[in-house]
Amino acid sequence: MNASQFRGAFTIFNAMHHTEENPWKITSEKNIYDNPWINVTEYQVINPSGNPGIYGKVHFKNMAIGVLPLDDELNTYLVGQFRFPLNQYSWEMPEGGGPQGIDPLESAKRELLEETGLKAAQWTEIQQIHLSNSVSDEWGIIYLARELTQFEPEPEDTEQLIIKKLPFAEAYRMVCNGQITDSMTVAAILKVQLLISENQL
């Protein structure tokens, strides 16, 4: 065994004997910022290497909800809007915040109707996702909505939305060529593409 093979074997050995126990120790914490949607906490910690440091965490007070609508002809709907934190336009599936303590499916139904005017008779949870787990505890649920009926959209007054109906295959191409970068939408479209390729839809 040469040196490179030995290092590879050592890495695999370490991974096999790795435990999932929390190696971080919190020595103190301080609330830095709070509003109705997020809270920012700064922690004084002992990190996994045993050294002191700080860690900032953004806590989201609502869960993230995403809905990928898919009709009988395998068309889907994207929502276009300008995203303030990115300072750029974004194409996404219908998304929003689901208050804690409320059935996330009810939040998903509300978001779909508000943003697209669609109601769905068939709902399937297809993915759960942590959106930025190095700095935030934000957690999301993604639903696939089928058997669609069109009504009037009911957008919030802070939203300026463009709704685009397109073949799902085109939405998949938009993910592949980088036109769609929203993480929940990327995850949803790739998951549905996998389900289609495995004849599960």
Give the residues covered by each predicted segment.
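Positively charged N-terminal leader segments that act as targeting/secretion signals
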Residues: 1-12
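Nudix hydrolase/Nudix homology domain
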Residues: 13-24, 89, 100, 125, ...
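Conserved Nudix-box catalytic region and its N-terminal flanking loop in Nudix hydrolases
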Residues: 21-23, 58, 66-110, 157
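Acidic, metal-coordinating catalytic segment for phosphate/diphosphate chemistry
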Residues: 29-66, 72
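Short, solvent-exposed loop/turn elements at beta->coil junctions and helix N-caps
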Residues: 29-32, 127-132
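Active-site-adjacent beta-strand/loop module that shapes the phosphate/pyrophosphate-binding cleft
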Residues: 41-49, 132-151
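Short aromatic/basic micro-patch
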Residues: 92, 142, 165
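A short coil-to-beta-strand element that immediately follows conserved catalytic motifs
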Residues: 119-126
